[in-house]
């Protein structure tokens, strides 16, 4: 066992003395040591309940004959960080979490690892750490929040974001927005639709790193406590069997994860995160792999924000095992932490609600929910969640309205300075330019709330999993490094064709070269972590990982 490095031999008497001060007994010195990375805090709704989940994991570890040691990691709530300077810190926190877990695992020589996490950057950060450390590991995701409810319909956080636009449009009063604000979020858990946190939980299960069914179980359901205990027991089995994350994160399992993502119509952020996880596993994964899978994987679940169904509906319909059941003929068989293969899990599943999880013969759409687009505006690629784009906007040509940053764009939107047909360009919001590649949920939600139907938005920043509408993000190269998006001027024609997977700037190359002669990136003064981050972060088409 790895942990023998700190507990065997007379030379380790000082190490053992410290362990004994924790209450570790002679008998326990001979057992596997399991690290439990718990991202609990009381500022993130998705993490508020993780203490109870971690406690059940610890009980499971002990029951299976190992010793649990809990440690903490940070976690940022993207919703609370949204729309201000705080959002610049969200994506960088992914790398911080991965590094922090690695530090604890390697310093203390744990034999196994359980990652207890829920929200947007915490799940991928812990996945990266688990694969990087490559000790037997299992992930327990905290589960979705129950939907809010008012006026006879289910609510989610996106209703509140879009309510801001409705107030600006005069179609909702501030009092009504206040009532919505108080009804939308009834308790702990990740935001209720197929936004980034829940998409990552589903992807983790499809990768084979969570027990079957874990992703969709609501945060407040006792089934979450049971699967947490089972996960604690199972990680001890993985230690004894010698099954490691890199045995599970393979080209086949990554393809399965992308298939599930496409079938669900998941968040565009999964492109960044899966590429980052693949890099830790030394598995080649590029943007074209997402298009290749999307073209042969039907979109079979019409989930919020593009559709009507919440994560609660997905859970009641059978969760990810039922989705795997419908995708069975599209899947590559691959092992999972459960000890059963992905096809065994699919064969044993049942679809309880065919309106929520459709067959591949009667899908929402014949192709997957994400597309990678390229063209003169995005030579190295960009990402669009086509599952949330009305088909009437799959082809669009319009004049650019250019904003150097989200704040200026938001002000113009709320003051109704945008015309139908415009293409909003929000730039200098990429990995280096933001820095931190902030999400543009506030402007996209404001556009929806104001009732704009034919306004597109393109950016080198990111979009929340809650974004809906014709929004293309992750444009690479970004403006800060001189990508074509830096050269766009007001009135330039931008051509979007999602059928052709293209995004073009209808400006002569010679004109762009003239503009480049006078282009300079905006000067800005950065300090602290962000100053270090911009020196090492890669472009979005490489997963925005740090070198």
From Swiss-Prot:
Q: Which domain of life is it from?
A: Archaea
The active site lies at 464 (proton acceptor)
Q: In which pathway does it act?
A: Amino-acid biosynthesis; L-isoleucine biosynthesis; L-isoleucine from 2-oxobutanoate: step 3/4; Amino-acid biosynthesis; L-valine biosynthesis; L-valine from pyruvate: step 3/4
What detail does the entry give on cofactor binding?
Binds 1 [2Fe-2S] cluster per subunit. This cluster acts as a Lewis acid cofactor.
What molecular function terms (GO) are annotated for this protein? 2 iron, 2 sulfur cluster binding; dihydroxy-acid dehydratase activity; magnesium ion binding
What PROSITE patterns would the database entry show? ILVD_EDD_1 (PS00886), ILVD_EDD_2 (PS00887)
- Which residues make up the binding site for [2Fe-2S] cluster? 119, 191
Q: Which InterPro entries match?
A: Dihydro-acid_dehy_C, DihydroxyA_deHydtase, DiOHA_6PGluconate_deHydtase_CS, ILV_EDD_C, ILV_EDD_N, IlvD/EDD_N
Q: Name one GO biological process term.
A: isoleucine biosynthetic process
The top EC class, named as a word, is lyase
Catalysed reactions, semicolon-separated: (2R)-2,3-dihydroxy-3-methylbutanoate = 3-methyl-2-oxobutanoate + H2O; (2R,3R)-2,3-dihydroxy-3-methylpentanoate = (S)-3-methyl-2-oxopentanoate + H2O
- Keyword terms: 2Fe-2S, Amino-acid biosynthesis, Branched-chain amino acid biosynthesis, Iron, Iron-sulfur, Lyase, Magnesium, Metal-binding
Q: Which cofactor does it need?
A: [2Fe-2S] cluster; Mg(2+)
Q: How does it assemble?
A: Homodimer.
Q: Enumerate the NCBIfam families for this protein.
A: ilvD, PRK00911.1
Return the protein name. Answer: Dihydroxy-acid dehydratase
Cite the source lineage.
Archaea, Methanobacteriati, Methanobacteriota, Stenosarchaea group, Methanomicrobia
